[in-house]
Amino acid sequence: VGIVKDILYKISSSQHLEKVKNQSVFPYYHIVANDKKWHIKYLYLYKGTECFYSDIELLSKHYIPLPVEKIIEAKEKRNTFLLTFDDGLREVYTTIYPILKEKGLSAVFFINPDYVDNKKMMYKHRLSVLLSFIEKSNFDKNILNQVARICSFTYRDEKSFKQIFLKLKSVKEKEIDQVFELLNINEKEYLEEKKLYLSRDEIQEMMDNGFYFGGHSMSHRPLHELTFEEQ
């Protein structure tokens, strides 16, 4: 999925929009930020504010903003667009929300309730944070070996370690807890300091100002990894 996201972020241009200009489009993002985000770094690319402004300008030039309440009628209209954002990251409130208000645009935000108010960290974000800390050690061989032992996998080199680690399934939560302990990272304190996700108050403020929120599953765990009962 990360590869698909990276491709989508790279190909935004008037040339590509020309190919789909006679239909509604729903560009989607996760985050807009100008600095490095450890919880995102190893997952996918993301755009800065300047590029996001350019995207809005490009879309507004070729399309008409689609009000959310008119989305059911969208199939009958041409050249409309509606922005969507996944995962409920904090930058939705601190960066994206002000820009959309400035431009007079609406949007839909799909969130995972388990992470609202920074109660805990999303599994894939935990993996990226851990890799970022391991990177600080210049991928020390001793640390890599300990992590591989805890998570029960073997690797050839630094590259294969990263690939395997990022593909660990969410059932490995307990092992990932141990890696946090190994690296001496207090996850609760990290969340309190970084505040990776939206709060209920921020969501309410945005809703009061005409923005829409939808569900993106409770915890974003891959459904194919869950039993029918867990789903």
Show the residue positions of the predicted features.
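Catalytic alpha-helical scaffold of carbohydrate-active enzymes acting on polysaccharides/glycoconjugates
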Residues: 1-231
